[in-house]
UniProtKB/Swiss-Prot annotation:
Lineage: Eukaryota, Fungi, Dikarya, Ascomycota, Saccharomycotina
The keyword Lyase is annotated on this UniProt entry: no
Family from the record: Belongs to the synaptobrevin family.
GO MF term list: palmitoyltransferase activity; SNAP receptor activity
SMART domains assigned: Longin
Identification of the protein by name: Synaptobrevin homolog YKT6
Length: 205
């Protein structure tokens, strides 16, 4: 069981607009990937998280399966969205318990007036505790312990998607989003295409 990524995003103001979710803070654990793969894999985790955060409406929880990975996404009514990327073995309930904890704490530390109108994130919006959490909560039992002080999670309200294609808008293709992405370097785009051809398990897509 493994957590690879925890991130907090500002949700788009309107779901129908071209605005993307804005990553406010994140942490990654790429230790299981080869040294030369880590940069490209890290970029794709951010790209994947941004893509699903942009397409998750306020109040919605959805888990998006892609390859060997699952992105757990929770968009809050306050205008922020949490994303947790794990392997397929990490249980759903602890994943959302951790996301809820992260978002609760983020809103206390960073009220909406700090990030509602910004055009780019900055270091003042980071959440240092994420580094602790991505280590501590590799053990799902630790996250389950939070349940004692949080309300019960209704797992039936979590939407499970078998592939990221299911959350894309009609007519959108993942390959096209990769090509148009400004957050991915040319080498990472090439890495994605090669990994897709070989069905490599070392890449997030």
């Amino acid at each position: 069981m493994k957590i690879y990524y925890i991130g907090v995003f500002r949700s788009p103001a309107e779901q129908s607009s071209d605005e993307k979710a804005l990553e406010l803070t994140e942490v990654k654990d790429l230790s299981q990937f080869g040294f030369f793969e880590r940069n490209s894999v890290g970029q794709f985790m951010t790209f994947f998280a941004e893509t699903v955060a942009t397409r998750t409406t306020a109040g919605q929880r959805q888990s998006v399966e892609e390859g060997n990975y699952i992105g757990h996404v929770y968009a809050r009514s306050e205008g922020i969205c949490g994303v947790l990327i794990t392997d397929k073995d990490y249980p759903v309930r602890p994943a959302y318990t951790l996301l809820n904890k992260v978002l609760d704490e983020y809103l206390v530390a960073h009220p909406a007036d700090q990030w509602k109108s910004i055009t780019a994130t900055n270091d003042s919006l980071k959440m240092a505790e994420l580094s602790t959490y991505i280590s501590k909560y590799q053990d799902p039992a630790q996250a389950d312990a939070i349940m004692k002080v949080q309300q019960e999670l209704d797992e039936t309200k979590i939407v499970l998607h078998k592939t990221i294609e299911n959350v894309l808008q009609r007519g959108e293709k993942l390959d096209n989003l990769v090509d148009k992405s400004e957050s991915l370097t040319a080498s990472s785009k090439m890495f994605y295409k090669q990994a897709k051809k070989t069905n490599s398990c070392c890449i997030i897509m």
